């Protein structure tokens, strides 16, 4: 073999033809480390950056791939493309050195002494990762004594991330920040409009928001031209009537004696307060709760604990804590009553005022609850006293279907018109019906099952009422199982009939129905699905976050009241157990309602 001449060795065995890629994991880090060492020793560098008369050597290629600013400078025919020294006019040496060091090392030391220089330079050179790190640093530094300065910094450099963070900070602490002279003097008009219109602004009440807007307008005469734009964000309907009339209007008149447009906003709210019963059908952007969250509420019922009878408690489910919290009390204890939501208000109607429910103690009372002020008012009573009936929201009205009272089972149906606070009869049911269940599905009223007399088996029937087509009840496909004292729910494209009880035909002995069936109006078919975990006649039901909640109830076989919560997930087609109720209870009502959000629930993170 000749010296220095390579030869190919013959293979004794054939190698595999399959390929494999090997990765040098540290190659990029080693490359940058090597380039940085060259730069520190002044080796292989082909450009010098000058700032504050100090020089920083670098590699054009690395600058170009790391910064759109340098990429354009070195490739678009600018004179700097061929210069060995480039002066960065207006840039500080502290900022340039920190950013260039960052491009080579990936490390960006930040502190109160260099942050302004680094941010300015990183923004100039369009090194956006460095800009983002500056924003992260500044977010940790936001306090009540510097947030306005940092907001101006964010606006100056178009730092959307920092700007949004400061907005959340201001919204969370609005009650304390907005009354300071610094805020009233320096906050920009478009920012204040955004805060006053926000669903997340944290403030004790709407009158305080008006006070902030009013004081901001008074700061400078030139601000008055923005009065309508600013005050349009105040929800005057949430301010008490007496304050609107004796505080808000006089102050507006003194500030804007010739203006009429702003006064119209207040007069609209005064009219809203005067039409008390019509408020549910007068809802607009300026009447709704700010930042409300949907909550599951449990109202009333019959309690099995010794010494207790009917409950007037209204509790809401704290999902995070997994417990029920009392919010208020109904005007009177009730069970077997019905509730519905219209225009953000709870209506509770009828029910029994005695544990001995049989119709003799049926009520005709209607009450309305306003979550904005935790306040109950009385509405016009129903034309007939009702217990064991159905109440639903139908457009801008409520509909009460069937039930019973001291005269016996009912077939009558009546509709409540909140605009003028009165009830009118509509088409009655084809049979006396009580102990049935109902739901509203895509604007149509459905009721199923129930009883017509004191004895005998329960019914399979399902009826529908569509006021848009005719004032009449129509027969639908009957349920697979007869049942009464059950629950119904509408969720997406299906209607559910849940639990209840029935009587054996031969012995008239009551038994629990755990089966659950789902109805598809498109195919007109019922399908059996996963049964309940345990019996639940006379339970409360509501739909929250695409899940069906069945609360409490009664077992006719064991004669026990339930304290449990059963939750149905339609995606998994299964029932799970939720947080226990405060007490063992049957005959409650449940509803989901938009409630005020707790101040501490808003986070700036």
From Swiss-Prot:
**Keywords of the record:** Kelch repeat, Repeat, Ubl conjugation pathway
UniProt Kelch repeat ranges:
295-344, 346-396, 397-443, 445-493, 494-546, 547-595
Q: Which PROSITE patterns match?
A: BTB
SUPFAM superfamilies named among the record's database cross-references: Kelch motif (SSF117281), POZ domain (SSF54695)
GO MF term (any one): cullin family protein binding
GO terms under biological process: protein ubiquitination
Q: What does the UniProt record say this protein does?
A: Probable substrate-specific adapter of an E3 ubiquitin-protein ligase complex which mediates the ubiquitination and subsequent proteasomal degradation of target proteins.
Q: What is the name of this protein?
A: Kelch-like protein 36
